[in-house]
C-alpha cells in the first residue's frame, strides 16, 4: 500500500526553483554573502570547489544589503564567490524513543553510529520554540526525589523546578550531575555538555553517568573546539529534545553543563555581528537569550521538565553578570563550596548559601521545621567555628552553641554521600528527623 501522505509531505517541502547567492567576505566567524529572500534563523548551504560536502550556516543578521551567516562547521575551504544555497528551513532535531541511550552532537546528529548504528527517528521537532504560556503551566506542587540527602532534606526540589548549580572549576559539578542523572525519579534524562573538554565527555558518560544511567538518557555534546554557533545550538537542541518528551506526558530531567559557556558562545556570535560589549564584556543578546532558553523548561499542561543548569563562578564571585542573571531567573540555586571540597566533603553542597524557592510548597511543615533545625546547627557552628577550634569557647555559655557542637559531626556525616550511593527519600526524612529530635509525619506531599 502506497503511503500517499508521506509523498505529499515531501512535495510540500520540495523547492522547484533553486535560489543561489555568493560569498562576498569571510571575516573571523562571520560569512558575508549576497543571498536573496532569506530570513533570520534560516539554514543555508555554503559550497566550495575544494570540498564535496557543503558547510551548513545559519542566517544571524543583515548588514546593508549583505546577509550575515555563522557556520555550523569548518570554513576551511570556503572562499570568495563560493555558492550559498538557502534551504528554506530552520534547524530541527529528530525526536523519538530511539534517542534514549544515544549521544548527539550540537546540531542533533548522532556521534555513536559506529557502536549503535544510524538513528532511526522519523519525527522532527523545531529547535526554537516558545516557552509554555504562563497560564497553562502547572504549578510546582509535587516533590521530586533526587536521591541525594543534602538536596532531598534541606533543598527539596519539585517536578518542573529549575535549579542552578553554581561552582568554580574542580569542585565536583560533573560528579553531582552524574548522581542526579542516576538517582532522580524521572522517565527521561537529557544532558547537554556545552563547551566541555573533549576528554571529559567520555569520562562523564562512562564514569559519572554509567551504563544504567545512559539507558534512559540522551546526551547532547558540543565540545569547546566546535564553532560558537554549534555550542549555542547544543543548548537549544537538548531543550527541544526535552520538550518533545514532555509533550508525550513524560517526567523529564534536563541537565546543562554549562550555562556560562552557552553565554560565552552567544557573546562570540554577538560580537561577530557587531554588537557592543556591555556588562562584564557580554553583549546585550546574551541577557536576551538566557531567559528565552531557561523559561522553556518547567511544567506544561502535558508533562514536566525539571532542569539543573550549572554555572561556572570565576573566583567564587556570585555577583558576576551571568551568575547574577541566571540566579534571578531560576527557582533555586545550589552552591558548591571549594572549602567543603578541600575537606573531602562530597557532594560539596553548602546548605547555608543554597536555597530551593519551592521547598515550602512541595515539602510538609514538619519536614520544613526539621530542615530549619539542621540549618540552625550548621549556621551556629559556622559562626562560632574559630572560637571552637581555638578552644576559646567554654561549654555552658550558650545552649545553642553546645547543641551545635554535640550534633555537628552527625549532621556533616548525614550530608556526605558516596557517588554510587542512592538515598531513599523517606529514609532521608527519617534520618533528618532523628538528627533534630523532631517528628516528621506525612512529610511528603503528593
List the predicted regions and their residue ranges:
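N-terminal accessory targeting/assembly segments
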Residues: 1-102, 106-111
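Flexible glycine-/small-residue-rich
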Residues: 25-27, 35, 48-50, 61, ...
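A generic structural signal for well-ordered coil/turn residues at beta-strand boundaries
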Residues: 19, 40, 99, 121-123, ...
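Phosphate-interacting basic helix/loop segments used at nucleotide- and nucleic-acid interfaces
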Residues: 3-8, 87, 146-151, 238, ...
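P-loop NTPase catalytic core
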Residues: 153-154, 160-446
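P-loop NTPase nucleotide-binding/switch module
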Residues: 82-84, 91, 98, 111-161, ...
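Active-site phosphate-binding and catalytic loops of NTP-dependent enzymes
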Residues: 53-56, 91-95, 110-117, 135-141, ...
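Glycine-rich, flexible loop/turn motifs
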Residues: 87-91, 107, 123, 131, ...
Amino acid at each position: 500500500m502506497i503511503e500517499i501522505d508521506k509523498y505529499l509531505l515531501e512535495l510540500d517541502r520540495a523547492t522547484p526553483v533553486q535560489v543561489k547567492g555568493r560569498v562576498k567576505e569571510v571575516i573571523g566567524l562571520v560569512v558575508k554573502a549576497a543571498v536573496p529572500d532569506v530570513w533570520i534563523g534560516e539554514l543555508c548551504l555554503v559550497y566550495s570547489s575544494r570540498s564535496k560536502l557543503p558547510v551548513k550556516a545559519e542566517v544571524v543578521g543583515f548588514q546593508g544589503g549583505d546577509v550575515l551567516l555563522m557556520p555550523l562547521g569548518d570554513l576551511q575551504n570556503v572562499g570568495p564567490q563560493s555558492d550559498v544555497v538557502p534551504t528554506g528551513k530552520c534547524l530541527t532535531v529528530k525526536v523519538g524513543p530511539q534517542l534514549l541511550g544515544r549521544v548527539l552532537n550540537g546540531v542533533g546528529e548522532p556521534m555513536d553510529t559506529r557502536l549503535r548504528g544510524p538513528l532511526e527517528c522519523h519525527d522532527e521537532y523545531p529547535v526554537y520554540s516558545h516557552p509554555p504560556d504562563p497560564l497553562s503551566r502547572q504549578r510546582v506542587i509535587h516533590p521530586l526525589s533526587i536521591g541525594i540527602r543534602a538536596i532531598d532534606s534541606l533543598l527539596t526540589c519539585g517536578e518542573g523546578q529549575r535549579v542552578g548549580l553554581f561552582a568554580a572549576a574542580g569542585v565536583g559539578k560533573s560528579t553531582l550531575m552524574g548522581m542526579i542523572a542516576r538517582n532522580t525519579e524521572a522517565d527521561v534524562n537529557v544532558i547537554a555538555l556545552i563547551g566541555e573538554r573533549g576528554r571529559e565527555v567520555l569520562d562523564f558518560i562512562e564514569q559519572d553517568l554509567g551504563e544504567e544511567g545512559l539507558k534512559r538518557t540522551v546526551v547532547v555534546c558540543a565540545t569547546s573546539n566546535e564553532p560558537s554557533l554549534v555550542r549555542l545550538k547544543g543548548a537549544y537542541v537538548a531543550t527541544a529534545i526535552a520538550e518533545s518528551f514532555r509533550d508525550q506526558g513524560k517526567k523529564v530531567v534536563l541537565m546543562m553543563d554549562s550555562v556560562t559557556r552557552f553565554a560565552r558562545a552567544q557573546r562570540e556570535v554577538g560580537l561577530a555581528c557587531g554588537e557592543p560589549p556591555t556588562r562584564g564584556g557580554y553583549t546585550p543578546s546574551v541577557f536576551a537569550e538566557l531567559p528565552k532558553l531557561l523559561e522553556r523548561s518547567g511544567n506544561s499542561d502535558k508533562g514536566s521538565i525539571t532542569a539543573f543548569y550549572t554555572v561556572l563562578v570565576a573566583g567564587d564571585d556570585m555577583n558576576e553578570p551571568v551568575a547574577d542573571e541566571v540566579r534571578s531567573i531560576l527557582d533555586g540555586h545550589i552552591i558548591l563550596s571549594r572549602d567543603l571540597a578541600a575537606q573531602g566533603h562530597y557532594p560539596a553542597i553548602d546548605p547555608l548559601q543554597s536555597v530551593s524557592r519551592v521547598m515550602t510548597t512541595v515539602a510538609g511543615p514538619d519536614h520544613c521545621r526539621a530542615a530549619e533545625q539542621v540549618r540552625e546547627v550548621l549556621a551556629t557552628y559556622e559562626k562560632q567555628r574559630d572560637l571552637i577550634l581555638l578552644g576559646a569557647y567554654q561549654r555552658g555559655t550558650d545552649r545553642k552553641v553546645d547543641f551545635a557542637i554535640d550534633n555537628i559531626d552527625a549532621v556533616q556525616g548525614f550530608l556526605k554521600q558516596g557517588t554510587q550511593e542512592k538515598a531513599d527519600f523517606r529514609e532521608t526524612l527519617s534520618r533528618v528527623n532523628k538528627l533534630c529530635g523532631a517528628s516528621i509525619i506525612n512529610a511528603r506531599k503528593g
